Amino acid sequence: MEHQSYREILREIALDNYGYVTTQDALEIGVPPGELAKLAHRKKGLLRNVSYGLYRDESVPEDPRGYSHIAEAVLRAGRGSYIHGESVLALHQLALVNPRYIYVASPRPARPSLPTHIKLSKAKAGAKITEYEGIPSQTVTNAIFECRKKIEPQRLEEAARKARRQGLILLNEWAKIEKELDL
């Protein structure tokens, strides 16, 4: 087996995470957390400290769909965090929603240093979480229900129908949506 440098190992993680590496990710695969800080300091332009415990590998290109920014928002909020509501609909291009903000739910208290485009809320106990495109997310069905008072009914119905056509909503979930949204 070929020996990999810490840099190579961290790049592998970053390639799977839209260019991002957390100190926790590094620790889990045997890279001492201090190595990230050393690489960020020493190797200018390769690894950049984004926030506490979060680094970006600058050799990994930004995702052209904008998913890198969404992944960063979730990672900044910490483990167990996920996108919800309008951000889930925006991720799938299901409805015209405000892309200026990324809505993230977190089980932990807010970090004071979050950028203003990240809107953090307390995660609901027992929330059903999944992953879309490798990004932790509320289910599309629950995002539709959450957006009932934020998006006009006709646009929300259109989003639900589009999600169903794309296979993002299961048949049993669709029955619940039809009943709840009176479709």
Enumerate the language-model features and the residues they cover.
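Short beta-edge/loop segments at beta->alpha junctions of small alpha/beta modules
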Residues: 1-80, 112-117, 174-175, 180-183
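Short glycine-centered helix-capping/turn motifs at secondary-structure transition points
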Residues: 43-45, 93, 167
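Hydrophobic alpha-helical interaction segments
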Residues: 97, 101-104, 108-111, 120-183
